[in-house]
Amino acid sequence: MGTRPCAGVASAVAAAVAVLLLAVSCFAAAATTTQKHGRMSGKGGDVLEDDPTGKLKVFVYEMPRKYNLNLLAKDSRCLQHMFAAEIFMHQFLLSSPVRTLDPEEADWFYTPAYTTCDLTPQGFPLPFRAPRIMRSAVRYVAATWPYWNRTDGADHFFLAPHDFGACFHYQEERAIERGILPVLRRATLVQTFGQRHHPCLQPGSITVPPYADPRKMEAHRISPATPRSIFVYFRGLFYDMGNDPEGGYYARGARASVWENFKDNPLFDISTEHPATYYEDMQRAIFCLCPLGWAPWSPRLVEAVVFGCIPVIIADDIVLPFADAIPWGEISVFVAEEDVPRLDTILASVPLDEVIRKQRLLASPAMKQAVLFHQPARPGDAFHQILNGLARKLPHPKGVFLEPGEKGIDWDQGLENDLKPW
């Protein structure tokens, strides 16, 4: 897992951190009198803000209730977990000005199927039910309207907020074994999972943030003048004792490495305990660790942005949400998984002016809006970022429409269990 730094290095790191904590606290106090609420000025660091209204039209299929509303009525926990964006996206589109009731003028077609709303008693989506729900929904759409069959879904988009997107499994090995459902291979997938060169991320997908309850976070706001007295903060698992007790497979060993190297380091406030003051603590921290787990993404990234805690992203090859609109390189610190043993030195070496710039950018309301699914929606929020991503794909290329006689979907392709009726 690496070696602990020698006493001289540790002392130098501690001294650098002490100076950083003092300077950042002074900046926080000064910022409360100068912060303006609006878009950041300057050439760098802005969130790309576009109004999608008038740039695209979306037709929302009216599906039988068994695909959405009945599932939600059976288990309202679906509205609270980190996969809830697929439900709120449906609600948003129903009243959005981009919605059209005339499918002939639509640029995009949306199928509201709540694949993450069939839950275990513990509140997790059932991985064997989700692909069956999706396949059944696509079959219904193809049999009821002519639009799917014109393109094999190439002008359709689907939300797939599962751990590994449209591979529909929380374990990577099983997700790769399934692969992206064959019926979705031509569709645009809007998903939380994003990792370069991975079979569960197909070209053209739109990577989005997971759902984190905006109202809950707002209820835990503290004064922005509060000193950031915590250098590094993290709460969560380091080992998945049930599935990977040694820690070598879970998070590719990165979380275990954080714990083994820094559990006794006073600069690191890290624990498996999740206190009632979790959100308040993030607002007192300079850096918040955002390591991969079973998948590279988690709601911590959203929480860190909202609370102005510089995200420390430890997830090699991650594709971040709305990367064409949010300047992640300017608001985050990226640490390679193999460099975790040097995490203290790396973070202590970030120049003070860079830390302050990242904090100033994170303080922008536009930055926070872009990662949140508000109810009701707000300009520039995650819903609008999705629409902007879809609008930027227009017009569709000529090859989107199937030629007469061109072979369409093989409805019998896929894993045997996935082909069972739902």
UniProtKB/Swiss-Prot annotation:
Compartments, as annotated in UniProt: Golgi apparatus membrane
Entries under Pfam families matching the protein: Exostosin_GT47 (PF03016)
Molecular function as annotated in GO: glycosyltransferase activity
Topological relation to the membrane, as annotated: Single-pass type II membrane protein
Keywords: Cell wall biogenesis/degradation, Glycoprotein, Glycosyltransferase, Golgi apparatus, Membrane, Signal-anchor, Transferase, Transmembrane, Transmembrane helix
Glycosylation sites: N149
Transmembrane segment boundaries: 9-29
Protein EC: 2.4.-.-
Enzyme class: transferase
Primary role: Involved in the synthesis of glucuronoxylan hemicellulose in secondary cell walls.
Name the UniProt record assigns to this protein: Probable glucuronosyltransferase Os01g0926400
Source species: Oryza sativa subsp. japonica
